[in-house]
């Protein structure tokens, strides 16, 4: 396995066609429509056809195909964050920058600035916006949390984490990744890279006072390892304001590191010792060989209803992992509270697939399948049925999506 591909996969949760694909003369069967602001934003990676990505506004999800006419080119494996009508493209493991776009009334996006996050490596781990004048972004290799003004995209401060108090096993490089703000405490997932993307054992999370921007303490739980994911971040809260921390277990390459979800209950600042949703140390019905190697991306739809992609090692090709062409990933529906789950009746997709979101009764999955096409497939929560072809077709792999 090539280390470059493995590191880029960290964006997946860690650039089919030539540049002319974004020209208005392409073969999109439906022209862009003028129906107001885009109601969906897609982040698409174009590998293996090209080493680039696109941020694509979609005005009308009833159109059968995604038009790239108004797309903005970015680096490979892009991810998204939003605030009001601002859309941010996060570089993940391919680009040190965060790019800002504004959603326009005519369905387009206007680029409105950028900021370099990590000044030591082409990486921007995750970001979140607090308000019009304050946002955070993580620089995993520089070991800093960058504070910036999201209106002007200017750096206003930083939190230096290069300290053995926040590292593991004597290291002073905690490698901050995911961010989540709850009750004025900034929760920061720490990669604790040993030899990236292999991490030191345990799920390490740093708590920061969001008023003073001073670290409060570091917590660790050794039941799972590698807290939060480059690009995706993936922490979320439920209706109880309980915080869930995803752990990807060094992709399953370290035997005693496991993948799944841990919890910090509402009003608490330590891991819940009574909760651990271990996704890799179990046997799954409907999965070839019964085992998953890791999970990177999750989507919480409410009332304990959780969706995710699971990587199955049974479908790795003879020449080793090919995260773009091997169809290794199953789509799952799970019960967050009972720690149970089932495989959904979708065709399998590639290892880069990360995009899951929902609108009302429809759950959208970005899939790149062997024989059923590529694009957005839908699970109907009312009828419990899965589409067997994309409701919206696109080129490339959808890495992330926002639905308005």
Model-derived segments and spans:
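Bacterial Sec-dependent N-terminal signal peptides
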Residues: 1-42
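Beta-propeller fold detector
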Residues: 64-74, 108-119, 155-168, 215-223, ...
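Acidic, serine/threonine- and glycine-rich low-complexity intrinsically disordered segments
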Residues: 173, 177-313
């Amino acid at each position: 396995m090539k280390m470059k591909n493995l590191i880029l996969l960290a964006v997946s949760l860690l650039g089919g066609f030539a540049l002319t694909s974004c020209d208005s003369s392409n073969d999109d069967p439906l022209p862009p429509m003028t129906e107001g602001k885009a109601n969906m934003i897609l982040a698409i990676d174009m590998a293996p056809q090209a080493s680039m990505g696109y941020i694509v506004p979609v005005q009308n999800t009833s159109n059968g195909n995604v038009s790239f006419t108004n797309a903005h080119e970015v680096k490979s494996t892009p991810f998204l964050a939003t605030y009001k009508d601002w859309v941010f493209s996060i570089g993940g493991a391919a680009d040190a920058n965060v790019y800002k776009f504004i959603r326009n009334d005519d369905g387009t996006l206007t680029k409105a600035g950028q900021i370099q996050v990590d000044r030591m490596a082409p990486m921007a781990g995750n970001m979140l916006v607090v308000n019009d004048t304050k946002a955070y972004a993580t620089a995993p290799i520089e070991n800093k949390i960058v504070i910036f003004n999201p209106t002007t995209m200017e750096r206003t401060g930083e939190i230096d984490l290069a300290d053995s108090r926040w590292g593991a096993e004597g290291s002073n490089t905690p490698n901050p990744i995911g961010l989540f703000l709850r009750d004025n405490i900034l929760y920061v997932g720490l990669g604790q890279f040993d030899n990236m993307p292999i991490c030191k054992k345990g799920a390490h999370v740093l708590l920061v006072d969001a008023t003073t921007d001073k670290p409060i303490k570091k917590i660790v739980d050794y039941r799972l390892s590698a807290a939060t994911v480059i690009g995706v971040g993936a922490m979320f809260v439920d209706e109880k304001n309980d915080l869930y921390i995803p752990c990807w277990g060094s992709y399953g390459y370290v035997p005693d590191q496991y993948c799944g979800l841990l919890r910090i209950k509402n009003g608490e600042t330590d891991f819940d010792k009574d909760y651990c949703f271990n996704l890799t140390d179990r046997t799954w019905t409907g999965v070839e060989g019964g085992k998953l190697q890791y999970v990177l991306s999750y989507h919480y739809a409410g009332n304990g209803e959780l969706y995710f992609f699971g990587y199955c090692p049974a479908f790795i090709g003879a020449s080793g992992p090919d995260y773009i062409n091997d169809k290794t990933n199953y789509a799952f529906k799970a019960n967050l509270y009972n720690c149970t789950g089932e495989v959904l009746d979708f065709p399998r997709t590639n290892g880069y697939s990360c995009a899951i979101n929902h609108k009302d009764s429809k759950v959208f999955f970005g899939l790149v399948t062997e024989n059923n096409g590529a694009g957005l497939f839908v699970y109907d929560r009312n009828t419990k049925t899965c589409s067997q072809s994309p409701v919206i077709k696109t080129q490339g792999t959808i890495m992330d999506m926002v639905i308005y």
